[in-house]
Amino acid sequence: MSKTTIIGIAGGSGSGKTSVTSKILKNLEGYSVALIEQDYYYKNQDHLTFEERLKTNYDHPFAFDNELLIQNLKDLRNGKTVEVPTYDYSNHTRSEKTITFEPKDVIIVEGIFALENSNLRDLMDVKIYVDTDADLRILRRIVRDIEERGRTMESVIDQYLTVVRPMHNQFIEPTKKYADIIIPEGGSNSVAIDIMTTKIQSLIQV
């Protein structure tokens, strides 16, 4: 197998990263592709009480176990199968369940801090930042957290104003400068997605 191509897709919460990723995956049908979500790598918090876990700031870079993510990517690139962790949001700690990933032609790493860590960026062949208006991002986050995570609207808005927005401005927005391409308006930008697909295909064939 040729060298594994690693793609990083970053952007704020609700920016449309998942939509962009889904369309790139669809365009790459016929290739062997794996999607690894950075959210899988929230740190294990078994050593903390449940009350302490409730205070976790999931929008801070320190919440992620990037060392494990980097090691998993290196192993996959070297042809090894890896066990990727998963996260239990109800208990605010790592789940006992893992997901088995085998080496692929392309690995997509998607997450709000996908471009924040320099050692992680160094593994990437293509770095993408999805840039979407803040008003649209908060609306998407409200819908997601209420429907998928059982949150109330009040709690989501409070978290956005006190944590998500400040963390975005401090840590996520600045990573835009590391991107090879910035995709405005997420998955609706078919031109940018097609350009990125063509670039990825060219890397696979090298």
Curated annotation (Swiss-Prot):
Entry-linked InterPro entries: P-loop_NTPase, PRK/URK, Uridine_kinase, Uridine_kinase-like
Positions that bind ATP: 11-18
GO CC terms of this entry: cytoplasm
Pfam families from the UniProt entry: PRK
Catalytic activity line of the entry: uridine + ATP = UMP + ADP + H(+); cytidine + ATP = CMP + ADP + H(+)
E.C. designation(s): 2.7.1.48
SUPFAM superfamilies documented for this protein: P-loop containing nucleoside triphosphate hydrolases
Predominant cellular place of this UniProt entry's protein: cytoplasm
Keywords assigned: ATP-binding, Cytoplasm, Kinase, Nucleotide-binding, Transferase
Pathway(s): Pyrimidine metabolism; CTP biosynthesis via salvage pathway; CTP from cytidine: step 1/3; Pyrimidine metabolism; UMP biosynthesis via salvage pathway; UMP from uridine: step 1/1
Keyword Cell wall biogenesis/degradation: no
One of the record's GO molecular function terms: ATP binding
UniProt cross-references to CDD domains, sorted A to Z: UMPK
BP term (GO), one: UMP salvage
Top-tier EC class: transferase
Family (UniProt): Belongs to the uridine kinase family.
Protein name (database record): Uridine kinase
Lineage: Bacteria, Bacillati, Bacillota, Bacilli, Bacillales
Gene: udk
